[in-house]
Structure formats: C-alpha cells, structure tokens
Amino acid sequence: MSERVNVAILGASGYTGAELVRLLARHPRVTLAALTANRKAGQAFASVFPHLGGLDLPVLSTIEAVDWSAIDFVFCALPHGTTQTIIGDLLNGPHGGRLRIADLSADFRLADPMVYQTWYGHAHEAVELQKEAVYGLTEINRAAIATARLVAVPGCYPTSAQLPLIPLLRAGLIDPDAIIIDAKSGASGAGRDAKEGSLHCEVSEGIHAYGVGTHRHGPEIEQGLSLAVGRPVAVTFTPHLMPMNRGILSTIYLRATAGNDATTLRQALSAAYADEAFVRVVPEGVSPHTRHVRGSNFVLIGVHADRVPGRVIVTCVEDNLVKGASGQAIQDMNVMLGFPETLGLDQQPLFP
C-alpha cells in the first residue's frame, strides 16, 4: 500500500457522506479522489454542503464517471437496496482484486438472506458477497475486519446496543432473555431526503416512538447478541425520534444473573474496554449525555443499579453520524488497511 490511498465516496450528498468528507479531509493517509451523487452530478461539493466549502474537493460525479483504476478504497453511503449490484460489479470487475469496501447501508449486515428479505422486502441480489461480508463492529470484530475486502458498517442503534451488551453476555453476567432497549435518536438518523416526518414542525417540541416492534435494527441487534451467547436471543427494542440533530441514547434494562449487580457489570465493561480508544465506561453515578460525544467517534457507557433488586440499567450514548455511521466506517478502514485505528478520528466532542 502506498503512502496515501485514493478514496471514493458513493452517495456523498447525504449526511453520512458529508461526515465522511469532513473526517477524511483531515486523515493524513487519505486522498479524496471521487465523490458521487448521481442527482447532483456536475455540482461543486461546496454548493451542497457550504460548511465544507474551504476544502479542495473533486466535483460531484456519477458512479459511472469514476476512474476505478485509480481508487483503492470505497465508502458506499447509498440507501439500502441500491448497493448490492453496485458493490458486486466493483468487487467482481477488473479492479475488484485491489478494492476494499466499507458499506454503510444495511445491505450486507444481516447474514441470513431470508432474514434480509423478510425485513427489507426484497430478495438479496448478491448472496455470495453477503456470505463474505464482515460485520464492522470494530471493537468486537477487529481481527476479521483486518482481512476483509467488504465490511458492513453497523447501524446506529445496533452499535449503541451491542457495545455494552456483548461483553456482558459473553461473561454470563446478564439474562439473555430479559433485555429491553429503549433508544432515542436525533433527526439526522432519518437521512437528508425530504420527508414530512422530518420537517421542523413535525419534530420540534415533541418526542415519539416509531417502528414500534417492527424496526429493522431489531434483527441486526439480535444477530450480534445471539452470536455472543451461541443461541438465539430476542430483545424488546423501541426507537424514538428526538428534537435534536445528532446523538443516540440507548437505555437498556437488564436482569443480572445470580451473584452479579451493577458493580460487577461496570467492572466487566471497564475491563472489556480498558484498552479501547473510543469506548469509555463512566464512573458510578454518572449518566452519559449525548452532548458529550457530539461530533466525535466516542461512546460513553454508564451502569446504574435499579431500585428493584437484581435489575440493572445501562445507558450508552454515541453520535449517530460518527460512531453510529461514518466514524466507525473510517475506523474499519483503518483496520482493513493496517493504519493506526484512531487516524483521522481523534477530534474531541463539540461542546456546548
């Protein structure tokens, strides 16, 4: 691998695309060589995202116009259902032997094609690649990510749920049949396309649950937790939309196994993430806040004793656009290419 890698971002006109550009622009080993947005092809990136107007960036283009012979790494930030054929063509094409890809859509997260079809409403069109794709929860799957050519970047809610839960399940500290995840996200999680439910007057000054019992991140969470314990795990998961731009707070209600409590759970999480750059377990009595991770790749986890004996409440916060999407994708890229994992991701949270 040369000193710098040429990167293409597919779907650069969305929020996750803009975050990829913002973060990669300061990555010392990356050259942004191609930015695609088919509906905005020919426009300057600054006309779409003026806050990044000071950067020297390529003009937005179509995917077909990219010189793939010059690209080393691809971030795919396109909607689910659109990436399977595109990624298949890239990896099976003349330059597929050298390309590495991080896909931010849901298309390669679920390992079972029938589960994907059930939740996303259509058959998977790249089943062989689906089998090959590595789930990119970096702190959990680092070794497999390092050798992958296709990584499926986890969803925002699944990241905030699995990071605290997987170490606890692996250690046998919680009952896998008694997990309730109450998650709240900022409006950017709905994407940048015009939708009535994302309008200011629809979101501001209120909060509501959505996808109750039917959200597509439920099976993604269950897949990861089931792998952690070696048997099927079902969770109760309900997301809520908050009147803020960024951030996710997952409040997770648990039943500790015999002999365990909030203290042993906190100790286990602290030990599991002691050497991790981006995951921090906060001290007893501290409740993490979304404003404390805004704009960063950090995750904060709090562990609290419930008033009901034997029950524990875990809270986890992240920026849904960074660790919940683009930041974790870059973290995966760093691992895939053998770069220091924190490269380009060491910025501190924005506050206030």
From Swiss-Prot:
Catalysed reactions, as listed in the record: N-acetyl-L-glutamate 5-semialdehyde + phosphate + NADP(+) = N-acetyl-L-glutamyl 5-phosphate + NADPH + H(+)
Single Gene Ontology MF annotation: NADP+ binding
Cross-referenced CDD domains: AGPR_1_C, AGPR_1_N
BP-aspect Gene Ontology terms: L-arginine biosynthetic process
Catalytic machinery residues: C156
Disulfide links within the chain: none
Species per Swiss-Prot/TrEMBL record: Rhodospirillum rubrum (strain ATCC 11170 / ATH 1.1.1 / DSM 467 / LMG 4362 / NCIMB 8255 / S1)
Intracellular or extracellular location(s): Cytoplasm
Pathway the protein takes part in: Amino-acid biosynthesis; L-arginine biosynthesis; N(2)-acetyl-L-ornithine from L-glutamate: step 3/4
EC number(s) reported in the record: 1.2.1.38
Pfam family, any one: Semialdhyde_dhC_1
Family indicated by similarity: Belongs to the NAGSA dehydrogenase family. Type 1 subfamily.
Catalytic class of the enzyme: oxidoreductase
Name under which the protein is recorded: N-acetyl-gamma-glutamyl-phosphate reductase
Main location: cytoplasm
Keyword annotations of the record: Amino-acid biosynthesis, Arginine biosynthesis, Cytoplasm, NADP, Oxidoreductase
Matches recorded under PROSITE patterns: ARGC (PS01224)
GO cellular component, one term: cytoplasm
InterPro entries noted in UniProt: AGPR_AS, AGPR_type-1, NAD(P)-bd_dom_sf, NAGSA_dehydrogenase, Semialdehyde_DH_NAD-bd
Biological function: Catalyzes the NADPH-dependent reduction of N-acetyl-5-glutamyl phosphate to yield N-acetyl-L-glutamate 5-semialdehyde.
